[in-house]
């Protein structure tokens, strides 16, 4: 690497993810999912976790090339099946209340050209099989953090004009370190100050308890109802054991769940979405009485239709997140083709499941109680970006009065 002080900064990054991200405590079990290309970072993460007293660190390796070959050539019945040993591993991790650290670095187009029905069948099977883990994660029963590492093919997509593959990787690592505050003199303090700023916005919105939100922008005119006693959350979270953690590194969002029964109007995406190894652009969605009645995409249309119409609960929304256009990630002008970063450059919505913590007492509710409270239940959760510097958002009170929240893509509340 030619990036100055790369090894030193990679070590700082690993410490940040383990100590502040999933917040490893003595006796914790840690599940790390990471690509084989990122072995150097994986070694650092494992060492840091054990240094903080982890009882066990389980590494779940992935490989884009192997995954692609499997999707192209494996028998269809194997694509549609989740092996028993994978379910057993999930049950083991749940029993141990394992903290989950997912490091994303995949090529956004790794599965381009794979038949959409094969991808859809696999996504549906894994969604059903790993539902208990999804529920535990989305109700913060365990600590979980999603982070990123600079994969070569991903870096080439983000920086196509780089003079070499090595330069592209360096440029992407530089952006990851910047957005995760690794370059700060005291990254831990910098994260606390950032989280405090986001928490202040969440408190204002929680006090307001708006009945609905109204989004307006070119290609968008959408009204989303909000559940009674909804909760706006921001950077930090608390697991069922009372331990703090950071779900996303980086993050710029304040988010809650809409009432899945109350969505009317239409919305257009403003950034590409990388989903299931495909890049999807120009998404347009129409809602009536909470349900998606039409969805199209200029690129990846069949993939999106399969997502929405072939997965349980995917015809409704599970998240609405507010991100100011002047956020550092947005102002970088870079499209990352990675939801972790692109969602933190833009207001976004999520198709599918809501986080249980988006309503008061939700972490202790049954699936049926969550649904009665207005939180969508689904086997999927897929964010897509809708924000821009032309977006206005109003909060609508119970009496119909409106309060400006965003004007021209930025906070005014």
Residue ranges, per PLM feature:
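Long, well-ordered mid-to-C-terminal structural blocks that present hydrophobic/aromatic surfaces
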Residues: 256-312
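Glycine-rich, charged/polar anion/phosphate-binding loops
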Residues: 130-132, 200, 208-211, 251-254, ...
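Extended hydrophobic packing segments that form well-structured cores
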Residues: 368-413
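Active-site lining segments that contact anionic ligands and/or coordinate catalytic metals
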Residues: 262-264, 280-282, 289-292, 315-319, ...
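Short solvent-exposed loop/turn micro-motifs enriched in small/polar/acidic residues
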Residues: 15, 206-208, 276-279, 313, ...
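Short linear motifs in exposed loops
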Residues: 225, 295-296, 406
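Dual-mode signal for accessory low-complexity, basic/Gly-rich regions
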Residues: 294-363
């Amino acid at each position: 690497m030619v990036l100055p002080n790369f090894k030193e900064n990679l070590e700082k990054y690993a410490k940040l993810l383990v100590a502040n991200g999933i917040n490893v405590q003595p006796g914790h079990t840690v599940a790390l999912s990471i690509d084989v290309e990122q072995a150097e970072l994986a070694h650092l993460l494992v060492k840091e976790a054990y240094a903080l007293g982890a009882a066990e660190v389980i590494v779940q390796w992935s490989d884009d090339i192997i995954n692609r070959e499997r999707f192209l050539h494996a028998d269809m019945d194997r694509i549609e099946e989740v092996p028993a040993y994978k379910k057993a591993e999930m049950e083991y991790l749940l029993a141990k209340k394992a903290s989950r650290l997912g490091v994303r670095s995949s090529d956004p187009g790794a599965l381009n050209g794979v038949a959409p029905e094969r991808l859809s069948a696999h996504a549906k099977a894994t969604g059903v099989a790993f539902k208990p883990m999804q529920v535990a994660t989305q109700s913060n029963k365990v600590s979980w953090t999603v982070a990123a590492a600079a994969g070569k093919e991903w870096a080439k997509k983000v920086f196509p004009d780089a003079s070499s593959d090595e330069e592209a990787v360096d440029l992407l690592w530089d952006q990851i370190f910047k957005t995760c505050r690794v370059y700060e003199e005291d990254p831990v303090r910098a994260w606390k100050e950032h989280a405090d700023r986001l928490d202040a916005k969440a408190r204002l919105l929680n006090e307001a308890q708006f009945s609905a939100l109204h989004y307006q922008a070119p290609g968008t005119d959408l009204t989303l109802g909000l559940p009674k006693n909804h909760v706006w959350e921001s950077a930090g979270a608390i697991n069922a054991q009372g331990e703090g953690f950071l779900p996303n590194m980086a993050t710029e969002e304040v988010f809650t769940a809409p009432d899945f029964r109350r969505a009317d109007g239409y919305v257009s995406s403003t950034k590409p979405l990388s989903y299931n190894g495909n890049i999807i652009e120009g998404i347009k969605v129409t809602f009536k009485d909470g349900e998606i009645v039409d969805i199209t995409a200029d690129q990846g249309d069949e993939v999106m239709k399969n997502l929405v119409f072939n997965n349980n609960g995917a015809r409704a929304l599970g998240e609405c997140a507010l991100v100011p256009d002047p956020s550092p990630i947005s102002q970088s002008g870079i499209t990352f083709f990675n939801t972790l970063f692109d969602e933190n450059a833009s207001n976004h919505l999520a198709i599918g499941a809501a986080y249980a913590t988006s309503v008061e007492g939700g972490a202790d509710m049954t699936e049926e109680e969550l649904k009665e409270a207005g939180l969508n239940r689904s086997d999927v959760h897929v964010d897509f970006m809708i924000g821009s510097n032309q977006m206005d958002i109003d909060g609508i009170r119970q009496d119909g009065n409106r309060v400006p929240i965003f004007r021209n893509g930025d906070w005014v509340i």
